[in-house]
């Protein structure tokens, strides 16, 4: 029996009341935007917040539970994920509604581009930058994603989240503890929805701002490639892409993974990359930048999962274990 089948059989009675979808041995390469990585023992897609809470209460705390959102800013290693992976469904967590003239309540699984389009139709300004963020709202809330000089934290009023025990928490903007590409409140929580606030603005002005965002992306980013977005955070006082370029890493390839010639802070899967190729490439870039400029780049992409045994002894990746 596979690991997923064994776990499902072990917990069968505990999970019998769930309404969401359980998939054993789910290929993470079908979920992540990199289209690489191993299998999750069990993938759970809850129907709604109540179903997710019931799941979290049913699964013993010693069994790992990992949230992956819509898989955009994520690199999964080749031996996959132990325990459960939770992916919020668009049906239960992907809707948005206007709750006041300038406020929107949106589910964590709504794609950022769809949120921007929804705000446009509602005539609510300040959401145009979401049109330039690859991923979903849950990830944007977790990492304070931003584009075109605007960050998610500037729009957040409150965030709903469940902890590992299935208990509900509601955080104000201040309680989220936002900083550059991070939120202090994100550890161990699954964000389910948020209330966001913009301002009244003419739809044509909003549309023009969104068009400008789209034009910028198409001009400088490899948006039609298999990519997870920005690979590294910008160091203080400089840009990650500049340091990568100065270190001679534009277009650098390892296996099927490449630092995009178009934007060298975007790592792409050219078609055959494994999770190992992608992470090894990223670590090679970090080493070369450190040697060239003394700057230690920090990963912006989240890396999860287990290495295959023949990969874990690699001298570059050994420091990551």
From Swiss-Prot:
Domain FAD-binding PCMH-type, by residue range, is: 36-201
Q: Which reaction does it catalyse?
A: UDP-N-acetyl-alpha-D-muramate + NADP(+) = UDP-N-acetyl-3-O-(1-carboxyvinyl)-alpha-D-glucosamine + NADPH + H(+)
Q: In which pathway does it act?
A: Cell wall biogenesis; peptidoglycan biosynthesis
Q: Name one Pfam family in it.
A: FAD_binding_4
- Catalytic residues (positions): 181, 230, 300
- Which cofactor does this sequence's record say it needs? FAD
Gene Ontology MF terms: FAD binding; UDP-N-acetylmuramate dehydrogenase activity
UniProt KW keywords: Cell cycle, Cell division, Cell shape, Cell wall biogenesis/degradation, Cytoplasm, FAD, Flavoprotein, NADP, Oxidoreductase, Peptidoglycan synthesis
A GO cellular component annotation here is: cytosol
Membrane-spanning parts: none
| Domain of life the protein comes from | Bacteria
Q: Which GO terms describe its biological process?
A: cell division; cell wall organization; peptidoglycan biosynthetic process; regulation of cell shape
Give yes or no: UniProt keyword Cell division.
Answer: yes
Primary location recorded for the protein, binned into one broad class: cytoplasm
Its localization reads: Cytoplasm
- What's the stated role of this polypeptide? Cell wall formation.
Q: Which family does it belong to?
A: Belongs to the MurB family.
**Which PANTHER family does the record associate with it?**
UDP-N-ACETYLENOLPYRUVOYLGLUCOSAMINE REDUCTASE
Q: What is the designated name of this protein?
A: UDP-N-acetylenolpyruvoylglucosamine reductase
Q: Which organism is it from?
A: Chelativorans sp. (strain BNC1)
